[in-house]
């Protein structure tokens, strides 16, 4: 059963394919191929590739198929060679019956592009059936008074063959009294008449037994025989006579079995048995005998089987009325079968293309044929589909229709369509058939990938581990399949100085971003680049997004002491007057941190000291000040270790070692210029220093003698230590100036200027009152406050 269903589906598909061929060659003459019935299966008929002017490969590539209305597939097309073969042995009598010629139409369907070629298979009859008499014995009663030349109808033989192979002649065994005349019924059938040659004499020959032979026209001819028994009777000179020689009736095809079709009537003027009439069919075919029956007494004709207009539309019957004396008459009954709307329309799907691309307007989705076996309005059909689908029906040739997309489809809105094709005939009552088709929509790359954000901000802590992810980007594509597969990539940087290829990489499959090297906040605080998302469609579509990477500072730099310089060969020694009061500014530790934020917030503390409690360090600015008055017991040389610590986590630190020399007075002021010229922004500060030096020089000339005497008296006094100025990488950060002014030699000033300072401040160290001045009240004048002149320095 499954094999039959599968075979039926294949036949239906073949039929659907033929639709395409008919559309392109509907107006051309059909291709004709001839084959004799009973030809063996597999017989070669023709090469379709040559007939159609196509190559064998093209025939196969275009999906050539055979479509026919037959319920069985009688032809087979070889896709490899293009040969058309006979798929089964044919019986012309079964396929066409008495119809001549026996033509089996079919169509050749080609796709890509769509074409239909009409073709016909003509089945030639062979002489495979011998004539057959339904009754092997025929009885006749003939009056002896019958005039020579009288004719008597005999039962005709049946031959299923047609044309020259059909029944062509009758003969009778040789005798002196009878011969056979052959007559044509006008419908392609012949029947025999027995003709009397001479007067009969019942007393001499009361009965004849003759052999009736029916011959067909085949080569060699076939024959069939029947025995004719003739009984010679006394005189019966009136034959039955029908009231009408021709009866025409119309019978609906849905008439029930047993219903009366028509009643015929004949009269006989004789009496007795010679006037008794019996009705019967004369030379009736087997189909007529299966469909009708006649009452031999009343002459009423009844249905013996159900009529079918779609099979046979007209029956022609010859009815014979025979009396008891053997005389007979005949009439003709023509039965026209009227059509009733008893067949629903049939939808024969030839081709279905599914799935179809979403951007394909005016695309043929399906080809089908509508067939209604009824006639007239009962066979006329109307085909439609629902309104809510983007498809239309287009009629074609020979009741073919194509289902075509009305506009481009959108797979992202509908992935499939369920289409109901409704076919309704115009009969009464109307019959309809519905056929459902599911059309899948295949994806086309019409949507570019879309990032979830137009820009991404990533925070990466410096000193990160290379090859670890630092973030990710994500894009989605509304398409499906490979059209929705997204490939991520880095786009070329718009900054030519940014080595993007050595900084980050991206996973092409998932969009994860990786740092290729450890980032250094001090070298690169932030950078940005663009990433692309490209699908795998054809052509590929893409989109972009901006990625900003902010490098977070880590506490990876220890404080660096700028002053005093720690790696100098000569240690920095700061002089400190023994008369300094508590809070006296000895020096200032200057340090920087390469980090930022709280990692660069520096704090200072005194770690070690020769005399604990003598000095203190301000935590926020690194100023080293005296914590108490100096005494004679304090060592002349003091060593301080200052700890500089940042505010990172964990904190980093550095130490600065200071040497402080306790002195009773100052030596000649000194002026040490920086190795590099100051910036133009500090020119005003330089002018101020020069002016101060000039005034001090004038003052020095007036007290030179006094100073010389005092210096000689203090030959044993310790020289004033000098502080080396940082060199190397920080030539412009600090400028130390020393000089003498117009004041007394007992005063010494040290001016510390920062080359990069924006405040243009300078500081005077407070004057030292030497022990040479006994008249001094011991009061020291402190000028330790920052001084800023009115010109804005």
UniProtKB/Swiss-Prot annotation:
Q: What intrachain disulfides are recorded?
A: none
Major place of residence: membrane
Question: Does this UniProt record's set of keywords contain Membrane?
Answer: yes
This protein's source sits in the domain of life called Eukaryota
Bilayer topology reads: Single-pass type I membrane protein
Q: Does the keyword Flavoprotein apply?
A: no
The UniProt keyword set, sorted, is: Calcium, Cell adhesion, Cell membrane, Glycoprotein, Membrane, Repeat, Signal, Transmembrane, Transmembrane helix
Q: Which ranges does the record mark as transmembrane?
A: 689-709
Gene Ontology molecular function: calcium ion binding
> Domain Cadherin spans what residues?
35-133, 138-242, 247-347, 352-451, 456-561, 568-671
Q: Which residues lie on this side of the membrane: Cytoplasmic?
A: 710-793
**GO biological process entries:** cell adhesion; homophilic cell adhesion via plasma membrane adhesion molecules; nervous system development
Give the protein's function: Potential calcium-dependent cell-adhesion protein. May be involved in the establishment and maintenance of specific neuronal connections in the brain.
Q: What is this protein called?
A: Protocadherin beta-7
Task: Supply the gene name.
Answer: PCDHB7
């Amino acid at each position: 059963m499954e094999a039959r269903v599968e075979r039926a589906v294949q036949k239906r598909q073949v039929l659907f394919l033929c639709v395409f061929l008919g559309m392109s060659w509907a107006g051309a003459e059909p291709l004709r191929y001839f084959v004799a019935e009973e030809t063996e299966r597999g017989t070669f008929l023709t090469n379709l590739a040559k007939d159609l002017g196509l190559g064998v490969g093209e025939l196969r590539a275009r999906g050539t198929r055979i479509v026919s209305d037959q319920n069985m597939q009688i032809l087979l097309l070889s896709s490899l060679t293009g040969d058309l073969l006979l798929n089964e042995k044919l019986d012309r009598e079964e396929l066409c019956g008495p119809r001549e010629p026996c033509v089996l139409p079919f169509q050749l369907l080609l796709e890509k592009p769509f074409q239909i070629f009409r073709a016909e298979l003509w089945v030639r009859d062979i002489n495979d059936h011998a004539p057959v008499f339904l009754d092997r014995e025929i009885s006749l009663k003939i009056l002896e008074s019958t005039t020579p030349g009288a004719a008597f109808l005999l039962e005709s033989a049946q031959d299923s063959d047609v044309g020259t192979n059909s029944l062509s002649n009758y003969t009778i065994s040789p005798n002196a009294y009878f011969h056979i005349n052959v007559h044509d019924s006008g419908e392609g059938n012949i029947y025999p008449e027995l003709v009397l040659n001479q007067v009969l004499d019942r007393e001499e020959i009361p009965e004849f037994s003759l052999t009736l032979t029916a011959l067909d026209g085949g080569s060699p001819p076939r024959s069939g025989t029947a025995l004719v028994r003739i009984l010679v009777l006394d005189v019966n000179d009136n034959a039955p006579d029908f009231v009408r020689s021709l009866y025409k009736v119309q019978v609906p095809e849905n008439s029930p079995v047993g219903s009366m079709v028509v009643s015929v009537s004949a009269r006989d003027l004789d009496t007795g048995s010679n006037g008794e009439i019996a009705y019967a069919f004369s030379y009736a075919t087997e189909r007529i005998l299966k469909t009708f029956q006649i009452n031999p007494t009343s002459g009423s004709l009844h249905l013996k089987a159900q009529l079918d207009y779609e099979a046979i539309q007209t029956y022609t019957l010859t009815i014979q009325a025979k009396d008891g004396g053997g005389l007979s008459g005949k009439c003709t009954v023509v039965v026209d079968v009227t059509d009733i709307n008893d067949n629903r329309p049939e939808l024969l799907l030839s081709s279905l293309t599914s799935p179809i691309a979403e951007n394909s307007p005016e695309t043929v989705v399906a080809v089908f044929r509508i067939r209604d076996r009824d006639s007239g309005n009962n066979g006329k059909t109307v085909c439609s589909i629902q309104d809510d689908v983007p498809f239309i029906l287009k009629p074609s040739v020979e009741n073919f229709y194509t289902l075509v997309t009305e506009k481009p489809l959108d797979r992202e809105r509908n992935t499939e369509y369920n289409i109901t094709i409704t076919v309704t005939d115009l009969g009464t009552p109307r019959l309809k058939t519905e056929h459902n088709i599911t059309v899948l929509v295949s994806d086309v790359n019409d949507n570019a990938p879309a990032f979830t954000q137009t820009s991404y901000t990533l925070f990466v802590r410096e000193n990160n581990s290379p090859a670890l992810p630092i973030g990710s980007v994500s894009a989605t594509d509304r398409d499906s399949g490979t059209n929705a597969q997204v490939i991520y990539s880095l786009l070329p940087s718009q900054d030519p100085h940014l080595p993007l290829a050595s900084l980050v990489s991206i996973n092409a499959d998932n969009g994860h971003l990786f740092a290729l090297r450890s980032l250094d906040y001090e070298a690169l605080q932030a950078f940005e680049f663009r990433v692309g998302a490209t699908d795998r469609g054809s052509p590929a579509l893409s989109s972009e997004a901006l990625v900003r990477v902010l490098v977070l500072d880590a506490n990876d730099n220890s404080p660096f002491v700028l002053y005093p310089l720690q790696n100098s060969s000569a240690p920095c020694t700061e002089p400190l007057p023994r008369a300094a009061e508590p809070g006296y500014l000895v020096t200032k530790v200057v340090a920087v941190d390469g980090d930022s934020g709280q990692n660069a917030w520096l704090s200072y503390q005194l770690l070690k000291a020769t005399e604990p409690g003598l000095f203190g360090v301000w935590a926020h600015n690194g100023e080293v000040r005296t914590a108490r008055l100096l005494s004679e017991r304090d060592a002349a040389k003091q060593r301080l270790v200052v700890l500089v610590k940042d505010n990172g986590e964990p904190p980093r630190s550095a130490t600065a070692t200071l040497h402080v020399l306790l002195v009773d007075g100052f030596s000649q002021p000194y002026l040490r210029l920086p190795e590099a010229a100051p910036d133009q922004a500090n020119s005003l500060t330089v002018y101020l220093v020069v002016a101060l030096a000039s005034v001090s020089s004038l003052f020095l000339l007036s007290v030179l003698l006094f100073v010389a005497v005092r210096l000689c008296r203090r030959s044993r006094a310790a020289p004033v230590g000098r502080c080396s100025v940082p060199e190397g990488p920080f030539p412009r950060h600090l400028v130390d100036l020393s000089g003498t002014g117009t004041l007394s030699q007992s005063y010494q000033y040290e001016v510390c200027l920062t080359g990069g300072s924006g405040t243009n401040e300078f500081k005077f160290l407070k004057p030292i009152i030497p022990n040479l001045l006994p008249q001094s009240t011991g009061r020291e004048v402190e000028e330790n406050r920052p001084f800023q002149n009115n010109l804005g320095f």
